[in-house]
């Protein structure tokens, strides 16, 4: 245990991990959501979390091929993990407004809906409607 205490908080493997499932309002707490559903975001991606965190000035890097262990869907859309540096070499906070991992997650969930990629995706939802009704043909009752 003394070995872990001697390691610097500025090393990349000491950065906190944020998976998209932590912020996803489609997930239950058992499935991995870590913030209240009222503050969660619909299907966030790791790149969106990275964009938001790096824009505020946090030291961030993206690991694209990492998967959250509770994520059953192995699709590329659900892959990725973001590592964020919370503490500097001397143990002090990088940014005072982010004292904990939960504060970073809440901030990311608040800012992701304001991204340009999210605000421009509002059009084109009517394509799923079917144009015509098919005539009902089926087998009749068997005649005796």
From Swiss-Prot:
Residues 117-144 are annotated as: Disordered. Keywords: Cytoplasm, Nucleus, Ribonucleoprotein, RNA-binding, Signal recognition particle. Pfam families: SRP19. InterPro entries: Signal_recog_particle_SRP19, SRP19-like_sf. It is found in: Cytoplasm; Nucleus, Nucleolus; Nucleus, Nucleoplasm. Component of the signal recognition particle (SRP) complex, a ribonucleoprotein complex that mediates the cotranslational targeting of secretory and membrane proteins to the endoplasmic reticulum (ER). Binds directly to 7SL RNA. Mediates binding of SRP54 to the SRP complex. Belongs to the SRP19 family. This is Signal recognition particle 19 kDa protein. It comes from Canis lupus familiaris (Dog). The lineage of its organism: Eukaryota, Metazoa, Chordata, Craniata, Vertebrata.
